[in-house]
From Swiss-Prot:
Keywords from the UniProt entry: Copper, Cytoplasm, Disulfide bond, Glycoprotein, Metal-binding, Phosphoprotein, Repeat, Secreted, Signal, Sulfation
UniProt PTM comment: Sulfated.
Species in which this protein is naturally found: Rattus norvegicus
Keyword Signal recorded: yes
GO biological process: animal organ regeneration; apoptotic process; cellular response to retinoic acid; homeostasis of number of cells; immune response; liver development; liver regeneration; ovulation from ovarian follicle
Name assigned to this protein: Alpha-fetoprotein
Length: 611
């Protein structure tokens, strides 16, 4: 079954588009001494070095011009070669940061001299903290126009592609380097094909739309993963990866899964730290390892492993989950056996829970990550409690029922959301979400609330197309990303204590916490302002989405004035507003009609709502 596009990118949360470099230099182990598969001592190839350097510099110095980025990139590569003779350094990123800070004129010009006055980890963290998605100083990204693309590409293909990489990187500072190079490869295919097409403009339009979607979704996903790592740490990331890898490769044993989880976690961390070279090098190594271990991992990646490196990672990520081994079952109440959980050391408990995550995940390939994390937490709590009981086996009698509660809650939410989507349609479902989220976070602007709830509706439109068994994982995966971005918004500009609690307490419980958080009880509505409820004839000219947005802004302002507004009151106000539109838009002097009838509607609404 072909997955919808949005389903695909939500599934990618635990992987990368890993491609385009030779094998890495560093052998690393985790806290239990589990060895990495990243054990080669080879150095990076020359292939794409300048493009990768462009990514690093443009993402750290987003305001820099193309010429400035070119100079810093060239100087950094020259320094690497001068220091080693072959460009192979243990810490390549530090060379780039040295070069960025060496340009004192630029550090003063773009306001990061304070970071450059620091050293080591502090300097790195300071520069990372300056990264901003869509900063005001950088205009929005637009794919090159048709008239520009063909002559520029024909004149200098390499420069055309590098300019594309620069433009994407500076506007998407959290987008992983492999993803940027993958998009650049798509651009490299699209331009010559469209320049020769009979309908050039239509060809470019189609290609641009597809690439823009991948760019937008990839950037959001990568920023989300980096924020989760920063907030909840490496151990949380490894737990997520054990789940996803166990679902994808159910034949693999726990030792192989732990190694892969360690390596993929390391890659995510390097990508998030802006270390594009190691991100790429280690990425290819992991994909190469996966292809060499198909017998113990999955045969579903066989066709992927025939592809060029540039396409290999994308293909493996989106390949179907492997087939479950015959006879694979799990009885949680018997998994511990006759061992005493209370006598385990902290390290033994972590390893045991990793094994449980592995077994539970490969037995439940369609469950959401968050549900499995919550199930594992409940399982551990039951083991802790029952290990203190005089009759441990009897204490565990209701274990299966307790663990099922998390699955049932998620599936019930998916069913309820899909039923509402089918009953109300996207516009009225969004209005329902708008009322709910305005009550939760009235401090958000109308534009932010409309954007967030629009994304929530897109979850239903995407996931409700799937079979029932896949809806929950699809919905929870996308909700995790969108709620994650609400938490990023809170991090940048605090919303309220309720949102803070949900964003800070538990990664696996964020969605449920936000769902259960009904209203910000600390919110005090502002004094009523008629300026927010002035109507003009432009309402009559507005059509489609523009008219819907105007109505939704009115709805948001009403809820901010009266958070406890009932459904009946909302329906009455909506009917009155529709009546105003119908009356005044038919009037010969529309503006005069709105000036006369608008205040009457406002007075009636204020009286009905008691504001």
């Amino acid at each position: 079954m072909k997955q919808p596009a949005t389903m695909k990118w939500s599934a990618s949360i635990s992987f990368l588009l890993l491609l385009n470099f030779a094998e890495p230099r560093v052998l690393h182990t985790n806290e239990f001494g589990i060895e990495s598969t990243l054990d080669s001592s080879q150095c990076p190839t020359e292939k794409n070095m300048f493009n990768v350097a462009t990514i690093v510099v443009a993402q750290f110095v987003q305001d820099a011009t193309k010429a400035e980025v070119n100079k810093m990139s060239s100087d950094a590569l020259a320094a690497m070669k001068e220091n080693t003779g072959d460009g192979c350094l243990e810490n390549q990123l530090s060379v780039f940061l040295d070069e960025i800070c060496h340009e004192t004129e630029l550090s003063n010009k773009y306001g990061f001299s304070g970071c450059c006055n620091q050293s080591g980890v502090e300097r790195h963290q300071c520069l990372l903290a300056r990264k901003k998605t869509a900063p005001d100083s950088v205009p929005p990204f637009h794919f090159p126009e048709t008239a520009e693309s063909c002559p520029a590409y024909e004149e200098n293909r390499a420069m055309s592609i590098n300019t594309f990489i620069y433009d994407v990187s500076k506007r998407n500072p959290f987008l992983y380097a492999p993803t940027i190079l993958y998009l650049a490869a798509q651009y490299d295919k699209a331009v010559p094909a469209c320049c020769k097409a009979d309908n050039m403009e239509e060809c470019f339009q189609t290609k641009r739309a597809s690439m823009a979607k991948e760019l937008r979704e990839g950037s959001m996903l990568n920023e989300h993963v980096c924020a989760v790592i920063r907030k909840f740490g490496s151990r949380n990331l490894q737990a997520v990866l054990i789940i996803k890898l166990s679902q994808k490769f159910p034949k693999a044993n726990i030792t192989e899964i732990r190694k892969l989880a360690l390596d993929v976690a390391h890659i995510h961390e390097q990508c998030c730290h802006g270390n594009a070279m190691e991100c790429l090098q280690d990425g290819e190594s992991v994909m190469t390892h996966m292809c060499s271990q198909q017998e113990i991992l999955s045969s579903k990646t066989a066709e992927c492993c025939k592809l060029p490196t540039i396409e290999l990672g994308y293909c493996i990520i989106h390949a179907e989950n492997g087939d479950k081994p015959e006879g694979l079952t799990l009885n949680p109440s018997e998994f511990l056996g006759d061992r005493n959980f209370a006598q385990f050391s902290s390290e033994e408990k972590l390893l045991f829970m990793a094994s449980f995550l592995h077994e539970y995940s490969r037995n439940h390939p369609n469950l959401p990550v968050s549900v499995i994390l919550k199930t594992a937490k409940s399982y551990q709590e039951i083991l802790e409690k029952c290990s203190q009981s005089e009759t441990p086996s009897k204490c565990q009698d209701n274990m299966e029922e307790e663990l099922q509660k998390h699955i049932q809650e998620s599936q019930a939410l998916a069913k309820q959301s899909c039923n509402l989507y089918q009953k109300l349609g996207p516009y009225y479902l969004q209005n329902l979400f708008l009322i709910g989220y305005t009550r939760k976070a009235p401090q958000l602007t109308s534009a932010e609330l409309i954007d967030l709830t629009g994304k929530m509706v897109s979850i239903a439109s995407t996931c409700c197309q799937l079979s029932e068994e896949k809806r929950s994982a699809c919905g929870e995966g996308l909700a995790d990303i969108y709620i994650g971005h609400l938490c990023l918004r809170h991090e940048a500009n605090p919303v309220n204590s309720g949102i803070n609690h949900c964003c800070s307490s538990s990664y696996s419980n964020r969605r449920l916490c936000i769902t259960s958080f009904l209203r910000d009880e600390t919110y005090v509505p502002p004094p009523f302002s008629e300026d927010k409820f002035i109507f003009h004839k432009d309402l009559c000219q507005a059509q489609g989405r523009a008219l819907q947005t105007m109505k939704q802004e009115l709805l948001i302002n009403l809820v901010k004035q009266k958070p406890e507004m009932t459904e009946e009151q909302h329906a009455a106000v909506t009917a009155d507003f529709s009546g105003l539109l119908e009356k005044c838009c038919k009037d010969q002097d529309q503006e005069a009609c709105f000036a006369k009838e608008g205040p009457k509607l406002i007075s009636k609404t204020r009286e009905a709502l008691g504001v």
